[in-house]
Structures are given as C-alpha cells and as structure tokens.
C-alpha cells in the first residue's frame, strides 16, 4: 500500500492551512519544514532589497531546516508545499529535498501565491531530488475539498 507525506513550509500560515486540508483529504502524514532561524516580518519584506527573502533568491542559498523527517523512507509520495517567492519555491525547499534520498519517490509540489502560478518552480526543484519523479504541481489557494480530492487523484 502506498504511503504519503505532506511536507510544507509556511511563512504566514496560508500554506499551512492548505497542507493540513490536503493531508486530511489524501490520508497522508503531515510534516512542517521549520527554518532553523524563523522568518520575521522584516525578513519577508519584498520591497526591501536587503531583506532575507530577497537575499535568499540566490539559487545557491540553502537556509537551514530545524528538524528532519525521520521516516522519509516509509513514503512513496511526498507532497511538498510552499509559498511562491519571486516566482519560484523558497530555497528552504531545496534544502529539504536535498536532505533525503528521494530516488524512486513521487514528489508532488503545491503552492500558495498572491498571483503567481507554478511557472519554472518544478524545473528549479528537480535538481534537488534527481532520482525522484516530479508531478507538475499546482497552486492551491483556497482550494475546495473537491479540488484537493481531484489533485490527489490526479497525482496518485
């Protein structure tokens, strides 16, 4: 039997809400990707060229994660949720993916965003989990349970 995990990073709580609902619909375990150094409001100020989120746009940046998923080997499908920052996933998602051997696993990205779509997000994440199979993913802002169920079914 296939076992699924919903892992997510949420700076403001929006992605957390979607992740919790998705885990329930998918019958999946839930894991929060917590940054070692929490983000402050100043860190998330998109207009500030020196804010942490702006500096972390560097594709080589790998913000530290505070905890690890001890039983990653148990999962066949890993849903990975995040807010879209600067048209891609925050680099903490790369940190998370690179911490595990995801060879043979299906990675299903999902995001929340104020206006962006997935764009090049999946392509940018694939290099962090070269042995995994990636789904196209989707932005799930305010998704109904029916949309979440369809998303799970399409990515089973």
Model-derived regions, located:
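N-terminal beta1-alpha1-beta2 submodule of the flavodoxin-like/Rossmannoid cofactor-binding fold
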Residues: 1-77, 87-89, 94, 98, ...
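A structural micro-motif
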Residues: 26-28, 105, 132
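P-loop/Walker A phosphate-binding loop and immediately adjacent motor/lid segment at beta-alpha junctions
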Residues: 50, 105-106
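Short, conserved loop/helix-junction motifs that constitute active-site signature segments
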Residues: 72, 98-104, 127-129
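Glycine-rich, N-terminal phosphate-binding loop of Rossmann-like dinucleotide-binding domains
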Residues: 82-83
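Short, glycine-/small-residue-rich phosphate/pyrophosphate-handling segment
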Residues: 108-144
């Amino acid at each position: 039997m296939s076992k699924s995990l919903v892992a997510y990073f949420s700076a403001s709580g929006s992605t957390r809400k979607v992740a919790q609902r998705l885990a329930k619909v998918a019958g999946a375990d839930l894991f929060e990707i917590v940054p070692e150094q929490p983000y402050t409001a100043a860190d998330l100020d998109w207009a500030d060229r020196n804010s942490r989120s702006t500096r972390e746009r560097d594709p080589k940046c790998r913000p530290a994660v505070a905890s690890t998923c001890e039983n990653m080997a148990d999962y066949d499908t890993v849903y990975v949720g995040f807010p879209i920052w600067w048209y891609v996933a925050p680099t903490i998602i790369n940190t998370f993916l690179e911490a595990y051997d995801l060879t043979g696993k299906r990675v299903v990205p999902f995001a929340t965003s104020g206006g962006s779509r997935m764009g090049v997000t999946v392509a940018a994440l694939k290099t962090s989990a070269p042995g995994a199979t990636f789904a196209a993913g989707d932005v799930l802002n305010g998704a109904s349970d029916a949309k979440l169920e369809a998303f799970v079914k399409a990515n089973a």
